[in-house]
């Protein structure tokens, strides 16, 4: 099977990108194992680190049957910005031109967002009779209405309306819709005004718990393995409720054994650093590579998921959620919705916006070893049952192979 993958912002298996692979990277690895021909269209701009990996269009051959086509476009500093819009439009248009020169694939698997990339995939699929599967990762453009202030939302409304029109068309014309949760799949079907078919399915974000290399560096001295560590890692941006983290930390200060470790960098790092400078039990550790994160998580007791209680996180299941439970870490969640239900149904954490309630829970599991161990086991069981990357992406590639076979049969008739 010849397949094109479209994903512009995830880590890739290339020499100058040392982060662990996410969803598209793991799908590509499973396809590679089965000797399928893969072209992954991505972006020369590293979305996580906000830096250019290459200064021109570049093809990286991972293996003989697996290539990554990095399309060059200008970078951006903020996730919601005009520069990012331009980046998305440029790589989408360049993809359209590049695609015309290549042998057509059997399938296209395109992440959503970006809207522009997905739109060009749909156009190509229609012109060339290639099935396009759209994989919903985030609820664009609806999230813009919620994340922008009222004046900015009003100014941006013409652009948002255009993007909403494009999104409806993408969801309507896709051969199939995938997503990372059932709720997000329903959102996509509603956008496309379509009935659910057997090909419209959701696959959770899988986390690969194998190959957990650990690097102990001098910096790791800041992690006290004997403390009751709550850990959180992310790009430090406006998706998270830092005020609540600080509020929770102050409530926990009375217990000197509890430490909140925050790993990451981003546009709001300097502001956060200033806010927590006098909070004794919060440690800002900066950006960490995957080996260092492994060390931190293996020496943590709880995983902190301080998402703002917005509709998109209420419908989603995050990378962080899967990673925390893979380590057997009960999760402290700030948002309601889909992840909240998973925690409640499986008794492996708490979801609340009430910091007093969160504080009581943390102190309770810290002081009740039996309760903590039961929750930790429940977290690992939930991971093994629903979030093991090898199982999820094996099933997903089985699904793609089945689509290819069935489409071939239709074309023969």
Language-model region placement:
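N-terminal subdomain of nucleotide-sugar transferases
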Residues: 1-60, 176, 247-253, 412-413
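Acceptor-binding helix/loop patch of EC 2.4 sugar-transfer enzymes
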Residues: 8, 14, 73-85, 103, ...
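Donor nucleotide-sugar binding/catalytic pocket of nucleotide-sugar-dependent glycosyltransferases
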Residues: 42, 141, 156-216, 283
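Conserved donor-binding/catalytic core segment of Leloir-type glycosyltransferases
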Residues: 207-209, 221-240, 245-250, 261, ...
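Nucleotide-sugar-dependent
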Residues: 240, 289-296, 303-326, 332-341
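Nucleotide-activated donor-binding/catalytic signature segment of Leloir-type glycosyltransferases, i.e.
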Residues: 270-295
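A charged, aromatic-enriched C-terminal amphipathic alpha-helix characteristic of glycosyltransferases
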Residues: 295, 356, 369-401
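Conserved acidic donor-binding segment of nucleotide-sugar-dependent glycosyltransferases
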Residues: 345-356, 364-370
């Amino acid at each position: 099977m010849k397949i094109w993958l479209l994903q512009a912002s995830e880590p890739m298996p290339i020499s100058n990108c040392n982060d662990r692979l996410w969803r598209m990277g793991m799908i590509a690895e499973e396809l590679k194992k089965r000797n399928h021909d893969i072209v992954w269209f991505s972006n020369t701009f590293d979305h996580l680190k906000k830096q250019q990996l290459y200064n021109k269009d570049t093809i990286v051959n991972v293996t003989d049957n697996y290539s990554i086509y990095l399309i060059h476009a200008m970078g951006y500093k903020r996730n919601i910005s005009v520069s990012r819009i331009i980046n998305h439009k440029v790589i989408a248009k360049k993809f359209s031109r590049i695609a015309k020169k290549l042998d057509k694939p059997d399938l296209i698997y395109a992440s959503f967002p970006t809207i522009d990339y997905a739109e060009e995939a749909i156009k190509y699929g229609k012109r060339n009779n290639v099935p396009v599967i759209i994989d919903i990762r985030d609820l664009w453009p609806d999230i813009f209405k919620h994340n922008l202030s009222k004046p900015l939302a009003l100014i941006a409304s013409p652009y948002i309306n255009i993007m909403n029109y494009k999104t409806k068309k993408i969801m309507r014309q896709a051969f199939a819709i995938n997503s990372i949760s059932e709720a997000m799949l329903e959102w996509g079907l509603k956008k496309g005004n379509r009935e659910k078919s057997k090909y419209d399915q959701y696959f959770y974000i899988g986390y690969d718990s194998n190959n957990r290399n650990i690097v102990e560096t001098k910096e790791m001295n800041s992690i006290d393995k004997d403390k009751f560590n709550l850990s959180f890692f992310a790009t430090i941006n406006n998706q998270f409720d830092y005020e609540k983290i600080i509020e929770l930390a102050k409530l926990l200060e009375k217990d000197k054994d509890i430490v909140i470790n925050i790993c990451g960098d981003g546009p709001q790092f300097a502001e956060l650093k200033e806010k927590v400078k006098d909070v004794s039990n919060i440690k800002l550790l900066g950006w960490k590579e995957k080996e260092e994160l492994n060390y931190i998580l293996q020496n943590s007791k709880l995983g902190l998921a301080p998402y703002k209680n917005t509709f998109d996180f209420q419908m989603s299941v995050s990378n962080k959620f899967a990673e925390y439970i893979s380590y057997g870490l009960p999760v402290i969640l700030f948002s309601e919705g889909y992840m909240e239900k998973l925690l409640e149904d499986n008794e492996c954490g708490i979801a609340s916006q009430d910091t007093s309630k969160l504080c009581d829970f943390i102190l309770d599991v810290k002081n009740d070893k039996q309760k903590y161990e039961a929750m930790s086991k429940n977290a690992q069981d939930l991971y093994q049952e629903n979030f093991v990357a090898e199982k999820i992406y094996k099933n997903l590639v089985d699904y793609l192979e089945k689509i290819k076979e069935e489409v071939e049969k239709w074309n023969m008739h």
